[in-house]
Amino acid sequence: MSTAAQCPPPRPGGGGGDTTLAALSAHMAPCRDTTPEQLAQLIDVHLGDLRQEQPNWTISSSTVAGRGVFATRDIAAGELIFQERALVTGPTARKGQLSSCICCHETLPQTGFLCRHRCTLPVCETCSDSEEHQAECEHFRRWQPKDVDAEQEQVNPMSLRILTAVRVFHLGKEQRHLVDAMQANAERAYRREIIQAAQCFRNFPTTDRVFMDQLFRIVGVLNTNAFEAPCRSGGHETLLRGLFPLTAIMNHECTPNASHYFENGRLAVVRAARDIPKGGEITTTYTKILWGNLTRNIFLKMTKHFACDCVRCHDNTENGTYLSALFCREQGCRGLVIPVQTRTLQPDWRCITCENVFPHAKMAKYQDFALNTINNRINSCSVQDMIHFINELCPRFCPSSNYVLIEAKLNVIWRMTRFDHEEYTPEEMGHMDRYREEVLAILHKLGAGECTLKKLITGEIQ
């Protein structure tokens, strides 16, 4: 992700220095103004045996944002563009993701789950003594974790979050050069991540200016470029935080011409979703493809710090999918209301039937109501209850095209095909098949081609 990708950090405490936004931005720029040619050389080394003899892609300057990936020849839909191993992985440190070993990702027991060498990281007994864990274990022990003498065993998400950055310090020279060459957004909120991590240790080197500058930039690179990649181990699935540099260089498009997926958290696979002409920029998406225009652009503005200018963002019907649509609030009208201006974050909304215009504040409350109502059901209902809710109750307050309701249908599909192992009635299976066809029809209208979501829904990839 050239100008953005997963979240941002700011200048750490200790050592003083200029903390103006201009200074932060200069500090986070790619190392020594790395040229696309130099970046390509670093990527070649990183790819190793996965680099094709005659790749169908190249790295070049982009009019979208800085640098991008471009087709060196015509690429057919479905064709492999590249595969890439993660440069570094680590835990997401999200609630619900704290009970896996940071090395092998097996589920940990309820007691005795911290490293036996007292680094306070969640590591299984086998991995505690592994070479893979040794350097980071010594690193954390040198900083003297405050939780080491705690009466009750617990995983500290703040110190766990910084682990991926610590692993970057232990990469090889050329790998570190690649990290330095990557974009890192300047964001003051990053400072909190580092300060919160520092407060977990008695001997965190906050006064070491060189170290703190390096850490700040590494955290910036990770928050700007890292992906969350699912990894299955020992019969359960966890999310890893992985840095895939080439995948991250691809720029954003709301309905991209390429799609990516991950194999067990450590391998990214990128394929063409549509035909890509020679010289065309190869794009990915930084958002969910089925989110509505307004939701996507709020997410991009808040987390990636840019506004998208793609064709889809200029079409308030989104190719006739009406993913953002809500019901009209005018008495007696059941028409669809959609945002009038798709390029603003607080647009007026207009009914396409009665043409009444409603202020954003009113429609935002309506959308929030639908979002919260549906999400609460997703988090608490059985599959059978969700089907009843989607079919009988949702039509009273939410159009069938609204992206939140589409997410609910996807939730049922995932639970019935990927996670649940119970038997379902033919009627329940019929509802799931109908949801699948509805989602596939929306993807077709969007022109999403052979995207990852389509392949997941149809079972082409797991």
Curated annotation (Swiss-Prot):
EC number in record: 2.1.1.-
CDD domains assigned to the protein according to its UniProt record, in alphabetical order: SET_SMYD
Pfam families linked: SET
Root EC class: transferase
Superkingdom classification of source: Eukaryota
GO molecular function terms noted in the UniProt entry: histone deacetylase binding; protein-lysine N-methyltransferase activity; S-adenosylmethionine-dependent methyltransferase activity
Gene3D superfamilies registered for this protein in UniProt: 1.10.220.160, 6.10.140.2220, SET domain
Keyword S-adenosyl-L-methionine in annotation: yes
SET domain: residues covered: 55-287
Record-linked InterPro entries: SET_dom, SET_dom_sf, SET_SmydA-8
Keyword Methyltransferase: yes
Keywords for the protein's UniProt record, in alphabetical order: Methyltransferase, S-adenosyl-L-methionine, Transferase
Biological processes annotated in GO: methylation; negative regulation of gene expression
A single Gene Ontology CC term: nucleus
Family note: Belongs to the class V-like SAM-binding methyltransferase superfamily.
Name recorded for this polypeptide: SET domain-containing protein SmydA-8, isoform A
Gene: SmydA-8
